[in-house]
Amino acid sequence: MSTEVSGLIECRPGARLWGPDDEDSVWHSAIDLFLLNNGNAYAGLACLFGIRNYFGFRPLAEGRGLPGDASEDLRTEYASYGGPPDVHGTTWITWAEVAAADWKETDSSGSRSRASVAGDETNWGPVWSVMRILGELHGADHVRLVVWFH
């Protein structure tokens, strides 16, 4: 049985304008992952999120759950997949974390780098491009990708 990834990129534009603690600094959905990434290569899922990690990557963002401050759009989309009974591995990662990752780091065999399985030249490239642009506009800590698996 295959594992599919779904999710959304969110941003918090008010945080840069008014500060992260302002009541108007809430998360907004930006774009559905489905529109940017048409693949579910397991090596990429392993190195990013620890899903099907037969490769021995040190995941960047494993098992963090659904953010408590997720946007209403994200909560609605997540619920449409059945929520916790029907999905697993829910997690999130900020653009700041993606940008700071060691993309030369390899799996346990030393044969696959993060860049080769989930870098700019893979199906993840469009996701990173959108997050990069939103990070330039709103700040790297105020852009995140929230994903779940089914």
PLM regions and their residue ranges:
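Conserved GNAT acetyl-CoA-binding A-motif
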Residues: 143-145
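Acidic (Asp/Glu-rich) sequence patches and key acidic residues
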Residues: 1-139, 149-150
